[in-house]
């Protein structure tokens, strides 16, 4: 299950204006005031007006801590604040306006003293301003650690967070390997004032910082024009992949999405010297191809068409069909739905050997996998027209979708010998049975292949080493996680081959892998390839993240990102292949959340700072590079300007202890937070296994809008089961999803409910995908005692309905853990009745979390007469819910529903009563 769209699902599509009423007026909408009592209704609004009138008449005065004071009445606002408070009638009684009886000389003395004080104040103010000690609020830099927000009056809007207003500008660099050995080359596509596709030396971006002795590679054009013609038609490149020798470019046009990562396209081979294109498949320019990949030797392209693998030789200008059994149920070289979604997170299951002599590819047989129908009522994803007379019927797409406990696709790794034009399979003794085998990673290691495979519930791992030329193989590592911590093995795609180089001290081939060590994920170096006892490169009570990032083979340095400073930060580190000299690359003296991408030769890198301050990006030389270089490529000045001008929420980070376990939280407070007021609180969470929602990234998202725009407190707590707090706290959830995740949200809510500034009667929780499941599970487990409201988008409601590879990793199979599946499902629906109200939303065409989940729960609710909920469904929308403006409706619905909840409207609905009949007076005739 991918991270929930609800975490950052903002659409790039233009949206209409969102009207935010200025007052809590029944006729215009109901924006909640954070200062209200636990049930805010219209009568209380009138009470507030009367209390303000009473205050004005002197019955009581509004002090700085008055809970009835509006947020915009803040005395600290430099433009509108009251520097000198007026006197009330009570004060006037104590200090009459007349000065009867005051000595004239004393009056003169007081006037002189007052004049001197005022003069001194004016001089001091002039000095303060002239020496730039004073800055208007709009000029003060954004401080993520601030506990007080300077008042500028500008509020964050839903339009902004739904659009791109608060999105940091971010650039990616397509680093490419030079055929001439130069490092730091990048691919520039459609750059301003440049040819369409250009190879440049990264140092040309700022040649002023380059040592004169360093040769900067000259730019070279690969594709000059933005369009190309073929057969009388004009085509525009969608995606491009240069060959390794940079003499040709593989181009994809007319891209059409399939699933989350996969797509169909027309492919072309573009000649750089001639500046002309030809179809990848000679004579068939319009054929839809699923995948195309260059050979590392630049003389051939492997591609998949109709689930069969082909080889286009450019040297001999011919096409060879490698497989012939592909079709609706057999995939060659590309993954099926579940492998694309849960294993490879991509559209390729084809791997070239570095010498171009072999192709490894996955053969997937879905024959035994049951189908699930996805209905489209308004669109036709197939692109076909309905038969005459069938226009009124929905299009149905049948997906081979293995649910928990059902038959999995059968996968086998096969090899193709290019020179012999021969496919073959290498038999490995002791392998998992067909229905109990997952192949999760394939890495070429010289003439050998490292293959990772697990059983279907992911608690036994085998690392197999295949000698392709000899057509033999054996398991070199076999681990049972039950003997380690009772959890599961994560799927990774970062295993790195380290070739032997005696001149560099590497006597034999090896590889770097992520392993379980010290209750965390750490890096290990296995050498030779068949060694099962590694050199540990990292250790300690912290984790490496999706590592290694890269390896500098010239200097035997491994670069990686880790949580060494804090579980909610990310810094870049380096360590020698010996496991010595671990040190930070980024500044660990300041909080930071970094990621990094390296050039092909590891001499340069794009370093991206994501928070907590305004994000920036720069190209740097790596520590081992003798030629130092640094160039800022993005400072996000416009974002920084907006952060100065707008009143962003106050973010408070910390930890809470639940059952002795420290859990990270972030609390977003309204900009003019007053601890003496009573605030409603919204808990937002995802809670999925290994995920993390609390981090130090700079974000202004929907949760920020809830705090800064609506005036509520918004809290996120990463409970047990989430990532980066140790495997012990992660794997505790195995076999019973939802038990601990819900428990920890309830425990956190009780902590907040006890705070003086929280209205314990107005607590809500929401989430999307796994977060939607945990929202419902929390309401079920809590039974209305803590959380009064919940909002669940695209929720799983029974793990028997979700895909096997994801679900069984955490739940085992229904056949072996039936009780766990029963208790993890949303079954105790009478407990949901104890909350005030909850909301569910789902996309009808969700191919990931099927609509079946919500429909089944609705039936359970009907069976026991539960009615305190609302439902909204979105035709033709998938898991992201975007079709026909749906994403905007999701967030409008969340917002308005939440406002009604915190304004007490759902309490009225729960006890709906008709008004008394008014007597009807007879109309008398006019005489």
Swiss-Prot record:
Report one GO cellular component.
vacuolar membrane
Q: Where in the cell is it found?
A: Vacuole membrane
For the keyword Protease, the answer is yes
Catalytic activity from the UniProt record: Release of an N-terminal dipeptide, Xaa-Yaa-|-Zaa-, from a polypeptide, preferentially when Yaa is Pro, provided Zaa is neither Pro nor hydroxyproline
**MF terms in GO:** aminopeptidase activity; dipeptidyl-peptidase activity; serine-type peptidase activity
Q: Which residues are glycosylated?
A: 365, 530, 828
Instruction: List the Vacuolar topological domains.
Output: 130-927
Q: Which UniProt keywords apply?
A: Aminopeptidase, Glycoprotein, Hydrolase, Membrane, Protease, Serine protease, Signal-anchor, Transmembrane, Transmembrane helix, Vacuole
Q: Give the active-site positions.
A: 769, 846, 879
TM segments? 109-129
Q: Where is this region: Disordered?
A: 1-44, 58-101
Q: How does it sit in the membrane?
A: Single-pass type II membrane protein
One BP annotation, GO: proteolysis
Keyword Zinc attributed: no
Checking InterPro entries in the record gives:
AB_hydrolase_fold, Peptidase_S9_cat, Peptidase_S9B_N, Serine_Prot_S9B/DPPIV
Enzyme Commission numbers on file: 3.4.14.5
Residue numbers on the Cytoplasmic membrane side? 1-108
Subcellular location, principal = membrane
Q: Where is the composition biased (Basic and acidic residues)?
A: 19-36, 58-70
Family to which this protein belongs: Belongs to the peptidase S9B family.
**Biological function:** Type IV dipeptidyl-peptidase which removes N-terminal dipeptides sequentially from polypeptides having unsubstituted N-termini provided that the penultimate residue is proline.
Name of this chain's protein: Probable dipeptidyl-aminopeptidase B
Could you tell me which species this protein originates from? Podospora anserina (strain S / ATCC MYA-4624 / DSM 980 / FGSC 10383)
